[in-house]
Amino acid sequence: MRYLDEVGLPHPCTRYAKIWNEIQEAVSYLGKPCYIKTDYGTASTGVWCIKNDHDLNFLKESLTAKGIINGQTEFLIQEASSGIFEQLHAIFDQGRLIAIHCTRRLKEGLGGGAIIKVGVDRPIVRKDLEKIGESLKWHGSLSMDYFYHEADDRAYYIDANPRITEPMNSVVNGINFAEMQIRLSLGKSIPTNYIDQITNKSHSTIQALLAAAGQRYSRLDVLKEMCLVATKKGIYKNSRESITPVAKDFPSIILLSAVLFQLLYNPRSGQMQAQKAISNYSLGTAIPKISGMKPEEYFGFNAKTNKNIS
C-alpha cells in the first residue's frame, strides 16, 4: 500500500499497526466493517473481517495465543471497499507491459476465491499497470486484486502477488501467461499482446463443490451443484472448466471424483480440504526468511560443497 501511495495509485483507506492498542485505534478510525491483514498470506489466510466488537475481541485472543502480537509483526488495517471485486493478471519484460487480462468474480467460493469468473476490459487498469511496470522495471508475472468503481472508472487495489495466479480464464480468452512466462525465462522476445475478445467465462468444479458443501453441510447441495456444472445450467452456461477438463484431460476425473465422493461421505470435510490445499503450496511464515537466504539455500543445496543442507 505504501508503494501505491508513492506512485499515486488508489487503494482503500489504510492504517498500519504493530501492537494491539494501535490496531484498536485504527479500527476505531476506519469504522466497521474493516479488514485486518498480516503482511504475508495466501488465499485469504491472514485476513480477518471485523464486523463488530465480538470479531475484534476474538481476533485478539487468537493472535495472542499464536504469539503474533509481539511488536515485530506489522498489521495492515483497511476499510471495507465498495465496488466490484476483480483481479488482474499481467506479465512484463524489463518494465514493459507485454500482456494483461482482467477478470470479474461472478460467484464466490471458499476463502473468497472465484468459482466462476468472466473476462472484462479495463483500460484504466492497463494504464495503472504500465505505470507500475515502468516504476519498478518489473520483469515477470504480477497479479493483483482490486475493487472496480464503475461510477468513476477507477480500480482500488487491495492485494498483489509476484506470480501467475489462476491463469485459465486468460487462456480461454486468448492469452497463455504460462507459455509467456516460459518464453520470457528463456530470454525470448515477446511482442505486446492485447486481445479484443475478453468476455469468455471459466469455472472450477472443485471450487463449486467445496463451496456447496460448506454452506449447509448438505449432500443434496453438493449433488445439485454437480448437476448444474455437468449440464452447464444457470451461471455455468457457456463456461469452460479450468482445473479438471475431463473431456480434454480424462485422468483429471480421478481428482474430481475423489473430491466429490469425499464431500458426499462427509460434507463437513470441505473446509479441511481447502485448508490442506492452501498449506501445500503456501510459503506462509517462511516468506520473511527468504530475503536473508543465499540462492543455493532456496533449494537446500550448498553449491560450494555439493552437499545437501540437512
Model-derived features: positions:
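Active-site "cap" helix and flanking loop/linker of ATP-utilizing ligase/carboxylase catalytic domains
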Residues: 121-148, 162-217
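Phosphate-binding site of ATP-dependent enzymes
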Residues: 53, 57-111, 117-128, 132, ...
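Short acidic/polar capping segments at secondary-structure boundaries
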Residues: 17-23, 40-43, 55, 81-83, ...
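Glycine-rich phosphate/pyrophosphate-binding beta-alpha loops
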Residues: 44, 106-111, 116-117, 161-175
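Short glycine-enriched loop/turn motifs at secondary-structure junctions
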Residues: 8-11, 40-44, 111
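Conserved N-proximal alpha/beta basic substrate-recognition cap immediately N-terminal to
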Residues: 1-21, 25
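ATP-grasp fold ATP-binding core
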Residues: 4, 27-49, 69-83, 100-104
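Peripheral (often C-terminal) accessory segments that flank ATP-dependent C-N-forming ligase machineries
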Residues: 23, 183-310
